[in-house]
């Protein structure tokens, strides 16, 4: 069992990583007998895990209600968020309730925002079931829903009480979702840890076949890196922005193509190549390093080009609505070397458009 602590003073919390956690009531601490829980999941995961998690919580004496959401990025919306609030109010649940997010990034982000908002804030626990959510979205307290004009535009920073990562969930993950998660894994190597990137080049095949020790190390290392960044910059005023490598471009793809048509990790993968090409054009990143990124993403089964039907010009309106924009100016996360990156302002739109065009599908 791996255990990492996100250090945020009185709001610190543990990340527990192991197989078989859904069989152990102690996995869901700080829940105690007699407490009330609203378990939030989706229609795909409910048949797989809802009864199991409900059973282990009830075994611990916890009173469990549940709400089942539709599955898909397009449902990460205010309308679906309202169904969670309605379920909480109908029971009713008070300020002493705990929300448990059993799902991937959509369920986790939406449930976290519900917890941040309901009666001005209630406790919640992240139980991520996808690789992407296990290595990234469940850690750090970013919660949100999407708006038609932009991804994650309505949300809050709100930390969970704990994160429970059961590696067994990956056994039911479709290959496309596994690849999507690997995009965020590869991101950590590019922005923060060149040694980890080297390890990924050597061990990607083991991850693709869900080798237990390799996957446990991979998830632990990603969580360690994110925990360090979040502890240093919880509200993304500086260092934490680096975690958005590829996201400014990627969010534009998701919004333009319609949420759910490109998985988040797929859009981020293409966006990371666009960021690398931008850095190349600025003369601060080598084409050889870009090729290493492209090769690893391709081996993972991820796209390295933008959608054919999306022109370079179509990216700009979305990128100019990005949450990192300051005084109307884009701020891009750009690699300087494998394992090192920067936040860069003042890059001309023409250069960015040319970098995007470099990455358009033939």
UniProtKB/Swiss-Prot annotation:
Pathway: Metabolic intermediate biosynthesis; chorismate biosynthesis; chorismate from D-erythrose 4-phosphate and phosphoenolpyruvate: step 2/7. Belongs to the sugar phosphate cyclases superfamily. Dehydroquinate synthase family. Catalyzes the conversion of 3-deoxy-D-arabino-heptulosonate 7-phosphate (DAHP) to dehydroquinate (DHQ). Keywords: Amino-acid biosynthesis, Aromatic amino acid biosynthesis, Cobalt, Cytoplasm, Lyase, Metal-binding, NAD, Nucleotide-binding, Zinc. InterPro entries: Dehydroquinate_synthase, DHQ_synth_AroB, DHQ_synth_fam, DHQS/DOIS_N, DHQS_C. GO terms for biological process: amino acid biosynthetic process; aromatic amino acid family biosynthetic process; chorismate biosynthetic process. Binds 1 divalent metal cation per subunit. Can use either Co(2+) or Zn(2+). GO terms for cellular component: cytoplasm. Its cofactor is NAD(+); Co(2+); Zn(2+). NCBIfam families: aroB (TIGR01357). This is 3-dehydroquinate synthase. NAD(+) binds at residues 71-76, 105-109, 129-130, 142, 151, 169-172. The keyword Cell membrane does not apply. Its EC number is 4.2.3.4.
């Amino acid at each position: 069992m791996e255990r990492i602590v996100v250090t945020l003073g009185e709001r610190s919390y543990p990340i527990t990583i192991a197989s078989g956690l859904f069989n152990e009531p102690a996995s869901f601490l700080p829940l105690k007998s007699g407490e009330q829980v609203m378990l939030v999941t989706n229609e795909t995961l409910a048949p797989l895990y809802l009864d199991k998690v409900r059973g282990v919580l009830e075994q611990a004496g916890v009173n469990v209600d549940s709400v089942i959401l539709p599955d898909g990025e397009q449902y990460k919306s205010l309308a679906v968020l309202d169904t969670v609030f309605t379920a909480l109010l109908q029971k009713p649940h008070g300020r002493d309730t705990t929300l448990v997010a059993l799902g991937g990034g959509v369920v986790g982000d939406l449930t976290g925002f519900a917890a941040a908002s309901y009666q001005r804030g209630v406790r919640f626990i992240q139980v991520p079931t996808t690789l992407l959510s296990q290595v990234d979205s469940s850690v750090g307290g970013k919660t949100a829903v999407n708006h038609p004009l932009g991804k994650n535009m309505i949300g809050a920073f709100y930390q969970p009480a704990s994160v429970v990562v059961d590696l067994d969930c990956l056994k039911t993950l479709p290959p496309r979702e596994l690849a999507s998660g690997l995009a965020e894994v590869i991101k950590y190597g590019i922005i923060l840890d060149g040694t980890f990137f080297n390890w990924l080049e050597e061990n990607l095949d083991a991850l693709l076949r869900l080798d237990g020790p390799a996957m446990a190390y991979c998830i632990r290392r990603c969580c360690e890196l994110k925990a360090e960044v979040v502890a240093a910059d919880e509200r993304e005023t500086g260092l934490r922005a680096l975690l958005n490598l590829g996201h400014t471009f990627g969010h534009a793809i998701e919004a333009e193509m319609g949420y759910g048509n490109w998985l988040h990790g797929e859009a981020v993968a293409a966006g990371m190549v666009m960021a690398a090409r931008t850095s190349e054009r600025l003369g601060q990143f080598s084409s050889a390093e870009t090729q290493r990124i492209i090769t690893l993403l391709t081996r993972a089964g991820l796209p390295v080009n933008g959608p054919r039907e999306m022109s370079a010009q179509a990216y700009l309106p979305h990128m100019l609505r990005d949450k990192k924009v300051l005084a109307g100016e884009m701020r891009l996360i750009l690699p300087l070397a494998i394992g090192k990156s920067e936040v860069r302002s003042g890059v001309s739109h023409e250069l960015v458009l040319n970098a995007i065009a470099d990455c358009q599908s033939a």
